[in-house]
C-alpha cells in the first residue's frame, strides 16, 4: 500500500444502505439511514434516543480545505495522512470530558471505526458559535484597521496582536446563507451580534429566547474545559468554533446539544505555550497550513479576496503541494491528537475497506 492509498479522500461512495442522497461536506459525508435500519440499531445497540429518531452514518475524510477550497499534494496525495482519525479522536475525547463535567450531550451515539460516527439527527442552530481568548485572525485584522466594535462588542484601546483579551469573548457568525433577517447580509460567515440573534432568534433556529443564554453558557463552559486541559499540555487554546442543535429526548422534550466537532486543529487555533512565552507563535492547528499557502503562492490576494473565487478554485485544483508540506500538516494533527488523548492515532492501510467490513459485519448496513 502506498501513502496515497492510506488516505481516505473520497468518502461519499461507500455502499451504505440509504434512501436519501448522501450529503457531502468539505470534510465529512453523511449517509441517512432508512427508517427500518435506524429503528433496528436503536433497539439492538441500545441507543438512548426515541425509537423513531433518524440516524446517520457520518464518515470523515482526510481531505484538507482552506480558504473554502480543497488542496492536494504531490504523488497523488489527495489528503493528509491521519487527519480524519486525528480530528475524530480529539472530538471524541473532548465530548467525553464535557460529559464528565456535566455539560450537554453531543449528537454522537456510537463510534464503529476511527473515521466513523453514528449520529442522531438534530435541528441545527444557524450560528457559528465562535469564542475568542486572544486577539488574532479576523478580529486583529479589523482592530488594526481602526475598528473597535466587533460582533457588537466594544474592544478597548491599546490591544496588541496575539495578546490575551481581558475576557473570553463570543463573536458569532452566520452558519450558511440566511435570508430575510433585518440587518444581516445574505452571505455565508457574516459576523453578527447577540442583539441580532435576540431580535431574530427563531430565524437563527433557537426554539426559545432563553436558549441564547444556554448556548453561550455551553460555549464558554466547553471552551474553559478544553483550555484547562490543553494548558496542562503547555498548549494555548486561542479561539474556536462550536456548533449546536436540538434533539428530542425519550420524554419528548427538546434539548440543546453539541454538534459537529469540537476543539480540533480544524475548528480552533492552538498555540505552543513555550513558544508563546518567548514571543513567538507556533501554530498547532490548520492556521499553520493557511499561513503556508499564503507564503507558497506568489499572489496571496487570490486566497483572501472573495471576488477572486474562480481563480482560487483553479489554484487549488491545478497545483500539487509539496509532499513535505502535506506531511507537516499530518505531524501537526496527529501530534495534537496524541497529546490530547494520550494514545497513538491509528493509521489503517486501507480505511475504506475497513469501514465497509465493520459496517457489514457489526451493523448490517452494507448493500
Swiss-Prot record:
Q: Which InterPro entries match?
A: SAICAR_synt/ADE2_N, SAICAR_synthase_Vibrio-typ, SAICAR_synthetase_CS
Q: PROSITE patterns per the record?
A: SAICAR_SYNTHETASE_1
Enzyme class per UniProt: ligase
Task: Keyword check for Nucleotide-binding, yes or no.
Answer: yes
Entry GO MF terms: ATP binding; phosphoribosylaminoimidazolesuccinocarboxamide synthase activity
One GO term describing the cellular component:
cytoplasm
Keyword list, A-Z: ATP-binding, Ligase, Nucleotide-binding, Purine biosynthesis
Q: Where are the transmembrane segments?
A: none
Pfam annotation, one family? SAICAR_synt
User: Which pathway, per its entry?
Assistant: Purine metabolism; IMP biosynthesis via de novo pathway; 5-amino-1-(5-phospho-D-ribosyl)imidazole-4-carboxamide from 5-amino-1-(5-phospho-D-ribosyl)imidazole-4-carboxylate: step 1/2
The EC designation for this entry is 6.3.2.6
Q: Could you tell me the Gene Ontology terms of the biological process aspect for this record?
A: 'de novo' IMP biosynthetic process
What is catalyzed by this enzyme?
5-amino-1-(5-phospho-D-ribosyl)imidazole-4-carboxylate + L-aspartate + ATP = (2S)-2-[5-amino-1-(5-phospho-beta-D-ribosyl)imidazole-4-carboxamido]succinate + ADP + phosphate + 2 H(+)
NCBIfam families in the record, alphabetically? Answer: PRK13960.1, purC_vibrio
The entry assigns this protein to a family as follows: Belongs to the SAICAR synthetase family.
Q: What is this protein called?
A: Phosphoribosylaminoimidazole-succinocarboxamide synthase
Q: What organism does this protein naturally occur in?
A: Shewanella baltica (strain OS195)
- Tell me the classification of the organism that encodes this protein: Bacteria, Pseudomonadati, Pseudomonadota, Gammaproteobacteria, Alteromonadales
Amino acid at each position: 500500500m502506498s501513502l496515497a492509498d492510506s488516505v481516505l479522500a473520497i468518502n461519499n461512495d461507500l455502499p451504505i444502505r440509504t434512501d436519501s442522497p448522501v450529503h457531502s461536506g468539505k470534510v465529512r459525508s453523511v449517509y441517512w439511514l432508512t427508517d427500518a435500519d435506524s429503528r433496528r440499531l436503536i433497539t439492538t445497540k441500545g441507543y438512548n434516543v426515541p425509537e423513531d429518531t433518524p440516524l446517520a452514518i457520518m464518515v470523515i475524510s482526510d481531505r484538507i480545505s482552506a480558504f473554502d477550497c480543497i488542496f492536494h499534494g504531490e504523488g497523488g496525495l489527495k489528503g493528509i495522512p491521519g487527519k480524519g482519525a486525528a480530528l475524530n479522536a480529539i472530538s471524541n475525547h473532548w465530548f467525553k470530558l464535557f460529559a464528565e463535567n456535566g455539560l450537554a450531550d453531543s449528537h454522537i451515539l456510537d463510534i464503529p471505526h476511527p473515521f466513523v460516527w453514528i449520529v442522531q439527527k438534530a435541528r441545527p442552530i444557524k450560528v457559528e458559535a465562535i469564542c475568542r481568548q486572544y486577539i488574532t485572525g479576523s478580529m486583529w485584522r479589523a482592530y488594526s484597521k481602526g475598528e473597535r466594535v466587533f460582533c457588537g462588542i466594544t474592544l478597548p484601546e491599546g490591544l496588541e496582536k496575539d495578546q490575551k483579551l481581558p475576557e473570553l469573548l463570543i463573536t458569532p457568525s452566520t452558519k450558511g446563507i440566511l435570508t430575510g433577517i433585518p440587518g444581516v447580509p445574505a452571505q455565508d460567515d457574516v459576523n453578527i451580534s447577540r442583539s441580532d440573534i435576540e431580535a431574530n432568534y427563531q430565524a437563527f433556529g433557537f426554539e426559545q429566547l432563553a436558549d441564547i443564554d444556554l448556548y453561550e453558557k455551553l460555549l464558554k463552559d466547553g471552551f474553559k474545559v478544553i483550555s484547562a486541559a490543553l494548558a496542562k499540555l503547555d498548549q494555548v487554546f486561542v479561539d474556536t468554533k462550536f456548533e449546536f442543535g436540538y434533539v428530542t429526548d425519550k420524554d419528548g422534550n427538546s434539548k440543546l446539544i453539541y454538534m459537529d466537532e469540537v476543539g480540533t486543529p480544524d475548528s480552533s487555533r492552538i498555540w505552543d505555550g513555550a513558544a508563546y512565552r518567548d514571543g513567538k507563535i507556533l501554530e498547532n492547528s490548520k492556521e499553520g497550513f493557511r499561513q503556508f499557502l499564503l507564503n507558497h503562492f506568489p499572489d496571496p490576494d487570490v486566497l483572501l479576496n472573495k471576488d477572486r473565487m474562480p481563480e482560487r478554485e483553479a489554484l487549488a485544483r491545478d497545483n500539487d503541494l509539496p509532499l513535505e508540506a502535506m506531511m507537516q500538516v499530518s505531524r501537526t494533527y496527529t501530534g495534537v491528537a496524541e497529546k490530547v488523548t494520550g494514545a497513538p492515532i491509528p493509521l489503517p492501510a486501507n480505511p475504506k475497506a475497513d469501514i465497509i467490513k465493520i459496517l457489514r459485519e457489526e451493523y448490517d448496513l452494507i448493500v
